[in-house]
A protein has these predicted regions:
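Acidic, low-complexity intrinsically disordered regions
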Residues: 1-228
Length: 228
């Protein structure tokens, strides 16, 4: 028996917190070679919807999801019809969705789905030119609406300018993520110093340890194989 897992960490859009109503999981083109191996089909040539039935490992409830190629040029895959699962599980930004495929001796596949809650102290997400951080009020020592914050990234301390974000959409997202209506969204203007590229596919988590802010980059997806 062969067990293969595809682990996908949710960003703002996928968790339904970015203002969009279309809930789906986007699989970036750089992940496609591994995803082809996981789904067991030639996804690069997928021209129609490919339905797959997943059984929730916690409740045994079955969910039918659809793998679909969204753009031939971008070679982007989407997992559609996942909204029921996301809502049933009260999914939040940073949570992990774990898709598991089990190969039977008969050659058939069985698919399962499960989730793992995000236990990060803070959560970051990226938009063009900005790095936004959702802050728990009890974990921030920032007393002014703008200033400097020393952040540790890859073992290096970097002083960054910050400001609190006043947009209603970001304030709403902050309150949903941490469950606190007084939560604030913080923005850094110099995220390139930390990330080094314009369109990172990974999630960022800002953790607090002994009063220090530590920025950790986490992969948005990964494939793992367990052969029995």
């Amino acid at each position: 028996m062969e067990v293969v897992q595809y682990i996908h960490r949710l960003n703002m859009t996928e968790a339904g917190l970015s203002g969009t109503k279309a809930l789906f999981l986007r699989i970036q083109k750089d992940a496609i070679p591994s995803v082809v191996k996981f789904w067991g089909i030639n996804a690069l040539r997928l021209d129609t919807n490919y339905p797959i039935v997943f059984e929730d490992q916690a409740s045994a409830k079955k969910y039918t999801m659809v793998l679909r190629k969204f753009s031939k040029n971008a070679k982007e895959l989407r997992i559609n019809s996942i909204v029921d699962y996301l809502r049933d599980k009260n999914i939040e930004t940073g949570d992990e969705i774990i898709f598991t495929r089990i190969s039977k001796i008969s050659g058939k596949y069985e698919y399962y789905i499960s989730m793992k809650k995000n236990l990060c102290t803070q959560f970051c997400y990226v938009k063009p030119k900005k790095l936004y951080v959702i802050l728990h009020k009890e974990h921030t020592s920032l007393t002014s609406d703008n200033g400097k914050l020393v952040v540790t990234s890859n073992g290096k301390e970097i002083s960054l300018s910050y400001e609190f974000v006043g947009k209603d959409t970001l304030r709403d997202a902050a309150s949903k993520i941490v469950g606190d209506s007084t939560a604030k969204a913080l923005s850094f203007n110099l995220y390139k110093v930390l990330l080094g590229n314009d369109s990172p596919n990974n999630n960022m988590s800002l953790k607090v340890s002994n009063g220090k802010y530590i920025l950790i980059e986490e992969k948005r997806w990964e494939i793992s194989e367990i052969n029995n």
